[in-house]
From Swiss-Prot:
The Walker A ATP-binding motif also binds Pi and PPi. Its cofactor is Mg(2+). This is HPr kinase/phosphorylase. It comes from the Bacteria. The keyword Amino-acid biosynthesis does not apply. Catalyzes the ATP- as well as the pyrophosphate-dependent phosphorylation of a specific serine residue in HPr, a phosphocarrier protein of the phosphoenolpyruvate-dependent sugar phosphotransferase system (PTS). HprK/P also catalyzes the pyrophosphate-producing, inorganic phosphate-dependent dephosphorylation (phosphorolysis) of seryl-phosphorylated HPr (P-Ser-HPr). Both phosphorylation and phosphorolysis are carried out by the same active site and suggest a common mechanism for both reactions. Residues 209-218 are annotated as: Important for the catalytic mechanism of both phosphorylation and dephosphorylation. Homohexamer. One of its GO terms (molecular function) is magnesium ion binding. Belongs to the HPrK/P family. The gene is hprK. Keywords: ATP-binding, Kinase, Magnesium, Metal-binding, Multifunctional enzyme, Nucleotide-binding, Serine/threonine-protein kinase, Transferase. Its EC number is 2.7.11.-, 2.7.4.-. It comes from Polaromonas sp. (strain JS666 / ATCC BAA-500).
Length: 316
């Protein structure tokens, strides 16, 4: 699901301190919003802000030093025509950056059309960077997943599985081994670009881990600040299964790496059987270390296949 609403006043207030901007025109249009069709069509929120562009009117239009010069360094009629064209396109917001002074014609036209315009002393490039990051998160495709989301060796790992298999207990064991908790039970996932999924904890569950028989644990209070993380990028899913499920549904040694689709992005997946006597925390750490090696181009399974092939050739 992708949200489609952000109003001019919310955009202004959320960045009043960071961008030091002022609302200079169109104060009566505080509820003006992005075009919903444009938001749904955008590949990411980053597409919704940029320098002055007549081809993409749905963007937040940024007017830096060059753009203001383009609008003012011609005859009065030409300048008025160029400014009028911007107003006709009805962008959600105009931002005059680089400590430039908005032309009087632009101010008056924005006021008549009730088009919100902000002015900031910050550089146009900085404004674009800040707004792209904000809009990418705000308009990101999102979903929730049940599990325990951890930072294990610097990799964002989601622990999933059937109810009663000890996901939270496993999370507690990993925390005691020096890894970090992002979220337990409900994990909010955001697709922030074409290849990246970011996981966060709902504010209500921040720093909390539920363990059966003990109840809710405040991980930050018990283990300290370094035991929790605010967010992580999802790189791997560890799925816990019972023995009968593993034998029925999965290969013992899959030839191709398993993946799971999350918001349209394939995420590496590892299946671990839960059984009495198995140290699942050690197995999860080993799986993560192996994944890190694979990301570096070291594939143990392929190396084994190559050794086996060479051994067979020698026997022949």
């Amino acid at each position: 699901m992708k949200p489609t609403v952000v109003s001019a006043d919310v955009l202004f207030e959320d960045h009043r301190a960071a961008l030091k901007w002022q609302w200079v025109a169109g104060l009566g249009a505080s509820e003006r919003r992005f075009d919903e069709v444009a938001v749904r069509a955008a590949r990411s929120g980053a597409d919704l802000v940029g320098y002055l562009n007549y081809i993409h009117p749905y963007r937040v239009q940024i007017l830096g030093e060059r753009e203001v010069a383009y609008l003012t360094n011609e005859s009065p009629d030409d300048c008025a025509r160029r400014i009028s064209r911007i107003i006709t396109l009805e962008p959600p917001v105009l931002v005059v950056a680089d400590d430039q002074t908005a032309p009087d014609t632009l101010l008056s036209m924005c006021e008549r059309a009730q088009l919100p315009m902000f002015a900031t002393p910050e550089s146009a490039a900085f404004v674009i960077d800040v707004l792209r990051a904000y809009l990418s998160k705000h308009f990101a495709d999102r979903t929730s997943m049940h599990g325990v989301f951890m930072d294990i060796l610097g990799m964002g790992v989601m622990i999933t599985g059937e109810s009663g298999l000890g996901k939270s207990e496993l999370g507690l064991e990993l925390i005691s081994r020096g890894h970090g908790l992002v979220a337990d039970d409900a994990v909010d996932l955001y697709r922030i670009n074409q290849t990246t999924i970011e996981g966060r904890c709902p504010e209500l569950l921040q720093n909390l881990l539920e363990v059966r028989g003990i109840g809710l644990l405040d991980i930050k209070a018990i283990f300290g600040e370094t035991a929790v993380r605010r967010k992580m990028r999802l790189k791997m899913i560890v799925h816990l299964v019972r023995r009968e499920t593993l034998e029925r549904d999965y290969e013992r040694i899959p030839y191709e790496p398993l993946t799971q689709d999350v918001l349209g992005i394939p995420v590496r997946k590892v299946i671990i059987q839960v059984e009495a006597g198995r140290n699942i925390a050690v197995l999860v750490e080993a799986a993560v270390r192996n994944a890190i090696l694979q990301l570096r181009g070291i594939n143990t399974y392929q190396e084994f296949v190559e050794r086996h092939r060479k051994a067979m050739e020698q026997d022949d």
